[in-house]
Amino acid sequence: MRTRSKKTKTVNNNNDLQKSEEKQKFDQLPLDLEIEMFRRLPLKSVARFLTLSKSCATTIRSPSFITSFPSQPCTLIASAATIRTCHNLPSSFKSKDQRLYFFSSSSSSSTVFSTRLTCPLSPYDNLIEYYYHYASGLISIGCNRKQIVTNPSTGRFITLPSVRRRRVVVKSFFGYDPVSDQYKVSCMTERRHGLRQDPSSEHQVFTLGEKKPWKMIDCTSIPDHRPWSNGVCIDGFVYYVAKTGQGMSQLSLMRYALRADNLNLFTSLPEELRTLKLSGDTLLNYEGNVAWPLQLHLIFNVWVMDQDGEKHEWLKKITFNIEPWKSSSRYLDVRGTTHTGEFILAPSHYPDDEFYVFHYNLGKNSFTKKKLQVRIYNVRIVSTSSIIGLYLSFSLL
């Protein structure tokens, strides 16, 4: 009968002890030094460190590391497209499905294909509304009871358990809390066969990484409301505009605290906005504040709110005119912002093969048009329904 050598066991224990001591030394390094070390590595090497230890992953995912690159704004573009493979076959034999493509731009004007995700989009996609939200490197895609979370850096995705209860999902939101290091998806549901002006009746939340089902949120203390805009996540809070009041005839800003799972009516809209016929429903994160761009003809008015102030006032209105570009572009929407404060504008639809976005610099009062050079081998984009969103994308989650 063989017995393990005590000498070998002692050597193994010494190796384990040495690795543990090295890990402790790394954990004790100042954050700025860790960030500088990772910045000197190639991106592929940085990605490998995500699986090395929780400490490395926390540093790489931190906002300090993400915003430490002194480069021009980097933009992530997510585009839902109907694709058809380009084989020499009759059209009836060519495959056709819905896919989600991610493109990322660098400091240059060109954009390269990044990753591709085949989503379970319905063949009746023009009749179904999908909700897309970004939070700290990940994107959630929601359609009724189906919820998907994807990593655009790797193309990987997970499908969440179906939302409980036989109800219709009115809207879904997505957020990240940096304190608890948790991602959460929240869904607002309503009774089947209800009217579009009825308030949402149940609110549920799912925490990524936890092996727990959807959890019901207690909303008995807040007024009835129905989500109307997209959601924007800032410092662990998800903000969205909702219809409130009698007959859902008013608009208010709601705030969902991710760590506490607490939802409340945060503030009402300015009196001036209540009298306008509002068409824009895209909230933005503008320099850490909630912003709402509204378009009147060729002029954009961007309202910015101070959510940290006592009165939660809408502090200022930014105005810029896109008339100089009306001849060279289609109808433009403000789709996002960069970490340097530039607004990103893009058409709602791309009916041909020309892809582009505009960057508006408020300080210089100037527009920059970026044409996106997109080439996908053996695939031709037949039609692109919309640009889903544009975001700062340095994260390697």
UniProtKB/Swiss-Prot annotation:
Residues 1-23 are annotated as: Disordered. It comes from the Eukaryota. Residues 24-71 form the F-box domain. Pfam families: FBA_3. InterPro entries: F-box-assoc_dom_typ3, F-box-assoc_interact_dom, F-box-like_dom_sf. This is Putative F-box protein At1g26510. It comes from Arabidopsis thaliana.
